[in-house]
Amino acid sequence: MKCKRRIDIEKFIFFINLVLLLYCLFSCKTVPTIPEKEINLSREILGKGQLSAVQLADFFITNNEHVEKEFILKFADYYIQEASMENINSDVAFAQMCLETGFLRFGGLVQPDFHNYCGLGAMDAEHPGEKFETEQLGVRAHIQHLQAYATTQDVQLNNQLIDPRYNWVHKTKLVTDIFGLTGTWATDPNYGNKIDEIISRMEVFIKNIKK
């Protein structure tokens, strides 16, 4: 008698579990997944960049693996620090550096020991470009030149001026975004689009590593 009662209880429990399982399969709604937040980097020259030094360095190394990680990490941090001082978008500045130097491969008029990362003054063999003492000062000059393009004459620098061409362009607000650099910073008709393409690659890279 006890054995039969035990079997009946087990059958009852099994039946209840089966009902619950079937209910969940046919009635429970699927919990919606939270959509992945897209990475949209600004193309504006003024403002704060979104990417960290680690993210910038990791992106850079995928395009030039011959540069030491420790160096490019410090170098990327220079861009973030210097850009922050002058309200310049560090993502834009870093992308422009990648374009101008071929991801620090150089190969044109400007040589690596010039510490010139944006082609300042590079015109011909007699004028190969401005030279700066250190990597950080070269980055600072780049940031200052972007600030000169993106602000009016009344906006002053926070760091000491080292860009020798700053006052040539710091009169009126010439540009607001990377596309305005076409025909102003460089004569290349696709200059702004080339920077945009690098920033787009940054967005894809960051999205992929977050998966």
Predicted feature residues:
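N-terminal secretory signal peptides that target proteins for export/translocation
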Residues: 1-9
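Sec-dependent signal peptide recognition
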Residues: 11-18
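Catalytic cores of secreted/periplasmic lytic hydrolases that degrade extracellular macromolecules
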Residues: 29-211
